[in-house]
A protein has these predicted regions:
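Residue-level detector of anion-binding/catalytic polar loops
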Residues: 74-75, 137
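Short, ordered loop/turn segments at secondary-structure junctions
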Residues: 80-83, 143
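FAD-binding subdomain of flavoenzyme oxidoreductases
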Residues: 105-109, 116-196
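N-terminal flexible segment immediately upstream of the FAD-binding catalytic core
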Residues: 1-67, 71, 83-114
Length: 196
């Protein structure tokens, strides 16, 4: 099976932007400067601009945005801190860029269990600053102050990987929003269970 992609029609994009603006107000941005800022990471690849940048603040908002974009067949690009070297931020067909910088809370720290719960926009440096008082540290260091969401998406590693593993070994569970807008939860805080 061959998948073909094409740029959405101007009508579909305009209707989607209008819907997003109605729901998220000034957190829906279409200025050239903001779109250009969100069109590339640290890599050298050149690509097109997203049609709009939206700043969600909750998983439910992301679910609603993805549901809308899925129905209109509008591409979506997630944006953490823009440190990607791999071209993840390329808006080849325009679309909606989800800037997760407003989802940057450390929700829970369980020092006794050596774990914590964070939102996708939390950066590596922010997490380490927030848990430092417990004597813990987050060992993944890809060299940039990347977001936890971006590091998870790329299975980041770094200079400490030999001793502490990659992102894969340092995540117990995820809350994920699927392209059709469903919110699913994977994993548990339990390190070992009857399920493995």
């Amino acid at each position: 099976m061959t998948l073909t992609f094409e740029r959405p029609t101007d009508t579909a994009v305009a209707a989607t932007v209008d819907s997003l603006r109605a729901s998220y107000g000034d957190r829906t941005v279409t200025t050239h400067a903001v779109r250009e800022h969100h069109s590339h990471g640290e890599g050298m690849q050149d690509a097109g601009l997203p049609d709009v940048v939206v700043f969600p603040e909750a998983n439910e908002e992301i679910a609603s945005i993805l549901k809308l974009c899925n129905q209109a067949r509008i591409p979506v690009i997630a944006y953490g801190t823009g440190t990607s070297l791999e071209g993840h931020l390329k808006a080849l067909y325009g679309g909606v860029c989800l800037d997760l910088s407003r989802m940057a809370k450390v929700l829970e720290i369980n020092a006794e269990d050596l774990d914590c719960r964070v939102q996708a926009g939390v950066t590596r440096e922010q997490l380490n600053a927030d848990i430092r008082h417990t004597g813990l540290f987050f060992p993944i260091d890809p060299g940039a102050n990347a977001s936890i969401g971006g590091m998870t998406a790329t299975r980041a590693s770094g200079t400490n990987a030999v001793r502490y593993g990659t992102m894969r070994e340092n995540i117990l569970g995820l809350t994920v929003v699927t392209p059709d807008g469903r919110i699913i939860r994977t994993g548990t805080r339990a390190r070992k269970s009857s399920a493995g």
